[in-house]
Amino acid sequence: NTAVPNQIDGWVAQQHLHQLEHILETYAQQFMIVACHHHPFDMQSKWIDQHKLKNTNNLLDVLNKHSNIKAVICGHVHQDSLREWQNIQFFSTPSTCVQFKPLSDHFALDDESPGFRVLSLKENGELDTVVHRVANTQQKINIEISGY
């Protein structure tokens, strides 16, 4: 859980880091995917990067101790992305509503269709992922709004 009451940015509380550590130790013989709402790494969008996970290093310290983590998935950024760190793939997933324009210094919506990501983690640790977009949407986007 990366939610912080009355905040837009994220934080993983110490108790949740301990809980994650315990789960990763308990299931050390199984490959794992970790999910969180807030993005741990910059998206190269000034406006959204100020709302990322604020204690990324704490999370990475936990992840770095475990070789069974294949991926971390997050939302919050309303766009598809991939980054790799220490052989762990970090994915963001599109929103099922409006998309945020990638690589934007200021808040901006994208005209990309709503979508979602499917992850398939096989017993051998192989990870497959695909993003599906909603076809033929009649979505009307107000590009004049200054926030979401």
Positions of PLM-derived features:
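Short acidic, glycine/proline-rich loop/turn micro-motifs
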Residues: 3, 43-47, 101-104
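Short, solvent-exposed loop/turn segments at secondary-structure junctions
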Residues: 2-5, 39-41, 78-79, 96-98, ...
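Binuclear metal-dependent phosphoesterase catalytic core
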Residues: 62, 84-148
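His/acidic metal-ligating clusters that form di-metal
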Residues: 7-91, 127, 143-148
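Acidic/histidine-rich helix-loop elements
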Residues: 5-12, 104-109
